[in-house]
Regions:
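Class I (Rossmann-like) S-adenosyl-L-methionine-dependent methyltransferase catalytic domain
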Residues: 1-42, 47-104, 132, 146-210
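Active-site micro-motifs of SAM-dependent methyltransferase domains
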Residues: 103, 122-123
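A short beta-strand submotif of the Rossmann-like class I SAM-dependent methyltransferase core
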Residues: 117-120
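A short, conserved alpha-helix within the catalytic core of class I
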Residues: 124-136
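Short conserved AdoMet
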Residues: 125, 142, 190
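Conserved helix-to-beta-strand junction in the class I
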Residues: 136-143
C-alpha cells in the first residue's frame, strides 16, 4: 500500500473544494436528518463533526440548536463553512477547525455528547487509521456518547472498480474510497455498543451506504 498516494488525497480534495464550492449542494444529507432525530431524542446539544466538507450538515445541525465543532483537512472547505456560518448568523454555534484527523484530536477528554461523520470513514484511511480514529472518538466523547458515521459499503456499484489501492480501497477519477463490510463496521466497535446498522442509498447513482 502506497502511503504517499493516500496522503495526496488531501490535495485532490482541496482542489475540488476550491473549484466546486457547491459540489455537494446545500441541503442536509439523509444521515444528518436521521442523526438529528437521535440527538433530539437523547437531548444532545454538543457534537463534534469529523470530515465536515462544505458544511451542509454542519449548518443544518446548528440551525437546529446544536453546537458543532466541525473539522476538515481542506482549508478551502473550512473557509467556506466559516463564511456560511457567518451568513446564517450561526457563529456562536459553530467552531471550525482545519485539521488532519489522522493525528490526535485537539480536544479534551469526554468533551462531546456525540460524534458525527458522513462518509469520512470511507476516505483514504487504512484499517489502522480507522482503529486509531475510533479510539480518539471514544476519548473525546462523554460516557454514553454516540458515534454516528456513514461509509460506502460492499453493495456499492463502484466496489472493486478502478485501481486497487490496498485493503478495501479503490481509486476512480482521482478519488480513493474505502468500502466497508458489516464485519468491518463491527470490528470498529471496540469500546462502543452497536445500536443499529442501516443500509441506505444516496445520490442518483446511487451510492450504497451503511
Amino acid at each position: 500500500m502506497d502511503k504517499k498516494l493516500l496522503n495526496l488525497q488531501s490535495q485532490h480534495w482541496e482542489s475540488n473544494f476550491s473549484s466546486k464550492p457547491e459540489m455537494f449542494g446545500f441541503e442536509p444529507s439523509y444521515s444528518a436528518k436521521k442523526a438529528l432525530e437521535t440527538f433530539k431524542k437523547n437531548n444532545i446539544t454538543n457534537i463534534i463533526e469529523l470530515g465536515a466538507g462544505l458544511g451542509r450538515d454542519t449548518i443544518f445541525f446548528a440551525q437546529n440548536g446544536i453546537y458543532v465543532h466541525a473539522i476538515d483537512y481542506s482549508l478551502s472547505a473550512t473557509n467556506i463553512i466559516k463564511k456560511r456560518s457567518k451568513e446564517n448568523n450561526l457563529d456562536d454555534l459553530i467552531k471550525v477547525e482545519n485539521y488532519d484527523i489522522r493525528k490526535k484530536l485537539n480536544c479534551d477528554n469526554e468533551n462531546f455528547q456525540a460524534c458525527y461523520s458522513h462518509m469520512l470513514f470511507c476516505m483514504a484511511l487504512t484499517n489502522q487509521d480507522l482503529k486509531d480514529l475510533n479510539q480518539e472518538i471514544l476519548r473525546v466523547l462523554k460516557k454514553g456518547g454516540f458515534n454516528i458515521y456513514t461509509a460506502r459499503n460492499h453493495m456499492d456499484g463502484d466496489f472493486k472498480k478502478g485501481t486497487h489501492r490496498g485493503e478495501d480501497m479503490y481509486e476512480m477519477n482521482g478519488f480513493i474510497v474505502h468500502y466497508f463490510s458489516e464485519n468491518k463496521i463491527k470490528s470498529l466497535l471496540n469500546g462502543f455498543t452497536n445500536i443499529s446498522i442501516e443500509n441506505f442509498d444516496e445520490g442518483s447513482f446511487p451510492r450504497k451506504l451503511s
